């Protein structure tokens, strides 16, 4: 299915419900359909880089749009959490981050910040010859062996800061008390602060463990562990591109 009605579209999409009946549907890809924005919609409604869907399709087909350092020519390509979208000809670079109102939003970032992607480890697989495969949240995989294996054999939900498009790991942030984190899902999505307490569940820890964060203003908020993304040590990583 190429299109869906606007009333069937994910609730958070920034599109007018009465403009047209049909709207572009995300293609299956690195992000779930209900957690992503089709690339053409991102250009038109979020970035205001074009006036019409036809214009969006044209610059995408012409190879002028990059997602995570790679040219994407599919106007239905799903763009999601922490993706880096660039239009070099327009000197435009943005990162997709969680938002407390609209679930996903964009922030402008510098050329230096656009070199880095932040993504969580969701699970790990041991392959032949002792190679460890890290399966990341956006569908990509990283193979570790030798010194890298001992250095980056980290717990699931650890956030990796990787260079684009080579996928070289530069930094890792593990979820623990004291680190700076952002909530990426649930009713508190978009809120951020230091992790002050982690209450581990007896079973299904990733799903049911409860994490308490403290904002810079002293406010506290809670969410399940699966909704937490570590983004720095004492404060947010400078290359995230957002001032928190």
UniProtKB/Swiss-Prot annotation:
Residues 37-123 form the S4 RNA-binding domain. GO terms for biological process: translation. PROSITE patterns: S4. Transmembrane segments: none annotated. InterPro entries: KOW (IPR005824), Rib_uL2_dom2 (IPR014722), Ribosomal_eS4 (IPR000876), Ribosomal_eS4_central_region (IPR013845), Ribosomal_eS4_central_sf (IPR038237), Ribosomal_eS4_KOW (IPR041982), S4_RNA-bd (IPR002942), S4_RNA-bd_sf (IPR036986). It comes from the Archaea. One of its GO terms (molecular function) is structural constituent of ribosome. PANTHER family: 30S/40S RIBOSOMAL PROTEIN S4 (PTHR11581), SMALL RIBOSOMAL SUBUNIT PROTEIN ES4 (PTHR11581:SF0). One of its GO terms (cellular component) is cytosolic small ribosomal subunit. Disulfide bonds: none annotated. This is Small ribosomal subunit protein eS4. CDD domains: KOW_RPS4 (cd06087), S4 (cd00165). SMART domains: KOW, S4.
